[in-house]
Each structure stands twice: as structure tokens, then as C-alpha cells.
Amino acid sequence: MAIPLVLLLAWLLPTVFAASLTQVSNFGDNPGSLQMYIYVPNNLASKPAIIVAMHPCGGSATQYYGMYDYHTPADQYGYILIYPSATRDLNCFDADTAASLTHNGGSDSLSIVNMVKYTISKYGADSSKVYMTGSSSGAIMTNVLAGTYPDVFAAGAAFSGMPFACLSGAGGADPAMSNQTCSRGQINHTPQEWAAYVHNAYPGYTGQYPRLQVWHGTADNVISYTDFNQEISQWTTVMGLSFTSNQTNTPLSGYTKMIYGDGSRFQAFSASGVGHFVPTDVSVVLDWFGITGGGGGNGGGSGSTTTTTSATTTSTGPTGGCTAAHWDQCGGNGYTGCTSCASPYTCQKVNDYYSQCL
């Protein structure tokens, strides 16, 4: 039986005009030789927000697009998605060269920023609502962009990353490279030294740095949990924030949400027993960015139970005669360093794996 033309068109239109992930060939200067993919929803908001979503090593833009569903909420809220795709070093983003770790230095970080500028210009996007997220290599790149282009990004969410500049000079960013000093958690600096790497990436910058969420699994055997603790100390020092409290079983059972300051600028999530890498909770990320919430990121999940505990003193006695300075680590499962804090500070438990002189 013949199908009436009107019914045929009604069936075809949603398929023909549905938004899809599309490659952009000419977005501007591309010193990192990255590929750019973009998702622009049909229901585009006036002055839409932008989310840059970055894949892990060995991944691609199309792979990461399919891994976590940011595009369905984009259809509802009208934001634009940018998916950079790395093409070198086992498809890892450049987080080790001076070019990528320097404001306007070039390489991958500048390529991604030029993708953002292209999108703002072409679609009238809101330059004050540019966000970034990623897993593993994408999480490391989130830290890189937060340090090198704090004037471009408003907030970020990094899943299983490491501190800014931890890979500096490593000669590569893939997990199989010979120099695994950073990924094994063997690079240790004071919080002030970690913060200096960030400040030196953009000399003269005096504005705010992006609000950040960092997530890490305690059983990560690719990027050490120590890197998570260093990541926390780096950014809380840059932002001038102190540990406030823990919220257990948030947003899932076994996860601990760590609040710094009032929780509006920096949050950390420790996932007990989770390996590499922590799965992305899209709803929590969108809330943190302010797309579905107020931008403070309450981090609650359906069915989760939350208890709040303030920092507690774990040790003030010396071990081996050494003393940890203000902000330094002083305890935690597997920790073998100084447990005595310089006066007047005390060693306060942040979680089972990390205590800090506060």
C-alpha cells in the first residue's frame, strides 16, 4: 500500500534534521594538529553555554561523545558541545611541553582555545559560560587549560587527572612512556610550589581561576591517588581555600565529597575502590557548571545518603624528627612521610588516604 506523502515527510524530517556530532575542518590556528568536533542542538539557547569534553588516551572525539551522554541534556538546555580529538602520542593530549603549559604558547591547549573562540564567534555563545571536562588525559588537559587559560574557562570537572605541570618535561603523555614518575605519584612538591607552576603559566594574570571539581578512585593503578592529593593541594593553594568538611556516600555509595571553603569554587570526590578512571556523573557536572543548578554543585545523587564530618586531628607527634609545613600532607593510608606539623598547625584528616597540616 502506498504511504501518503504527508506521512512520509513527517517520518523523514526528524531523521534528516536531527542534530549530530559534526567535524569542523577550519576553526582557526591549530598548532596542536587536533581535530574538532561539535554538537549544536536544534534547540540552541540565546547566547548558549559551551562545554569542551576531552577524551582519554587512546580515545577520540566520537568515542567520548558516545561514552557519556552530554548531548541529550544539550537538546534540552541548548548548550553547545566541543569535542577535541588528539592525533599524536597514542591520542593523548599534550600536557608535557612548555608550549602547551604556557598561555598563548601553542600546541594542544591553544588549539582547544581557538575551537572555543570559533564557536563563540559563529554561534554567539556566551564567553562567560565556557566549561571543560574530561577523563584521564582529558582530565589532565582540564587542569592544563585551567592553568594556562583561566580567562577563557569558567569551570571544569576532571575525572582521574593529575596536577597542572606534573608531566612537564616528561617527553610524552601516554601511559606506556618510559617516564612514569608523575603517573606513579613520585613527583612531590609543596602546595606553594605546585601553585607556582600555575601562576608561572600565565605571568601577570590577576583574575580568578576556574571553579574546579576533581574526581579520583582510590584503586587507580594508572594515575596514582597521590596525584589526586597533589591536585587538591595545588588548586586549593591557588584559590586560597582551606578544607571544610567531608560528605560521605555522595553522590554514590563509597564516594566522599570533600568541601573546601564554602564549596562554590573547589570540590574533590574520592571514590573508594574505584580504579582508572572514575565514571562521569553527567548530572553532577551539569549542576556544577550551573547549567541545571546554581553552579555550586551540591553533588547529591538519587538514593545517596550523606553525612557531614569536619576535619579531625589525626597526629601532632613527630616521626623521625621531621616536620611537615602548613598545607603539606601529614598522614593517610600508605603515607610514610612526616606526621608532625609545624606550629601552630595540626594534622587533620581529610579522608582515609590523606591528612593535611591545617
From Swiss-Prot:
Residue positions of the active site: S136
Enzyme nomenclature, EC number: 3.1.1.73
Chain intervals for the UniProt region annotation (Disordered): 297-318
Region described as Catalytic: spans on this chain: 19-291
Keyword Repeat: no
Region described as Gly/Thr-rich linker: spans on this chain: 292-321
Gene3D superfamilies: alpha/beta hydrolase
Molecular function terms from GO: cellulose binding; feruloyl esterase activity
Reaction catalysis annotation: feruloyl-polysaccharide + H2O = ferulate + polysaccharide
Cellular component GO terms, alphabetical: extracellular region
Keywords: Carbohydrate metabolism, Glycoprotein, Hydrolase, Polysaccharide degradation, Secreted, Serine esterase, Signal, Xylan degradation
Domain CBM1: 322-358
Extent of Low complexity compositional bias: 304-318
Cellular localisation: Secreted
Function recorded in the entry: Involved in degradation of plant cell walls. Hydrolyzes the feruloyl-arabinose ester bond in arabinoxylans as well as the feruloyl-galactose and feruloyl-arabinose ester bonds in pectin. Active against methyl esters of caffeate (MCA), but not sinapate (MSA).
PANTHER family: FERULOYL ESTERASE B, UNNAMED PRODUCT-RELATED
Protein name: Feruloyl esterase B
Organism: Talaromyces stipitatus (strain ATCC 10500 / CBS 375.48 / QM 6759 / NRRL 1006)
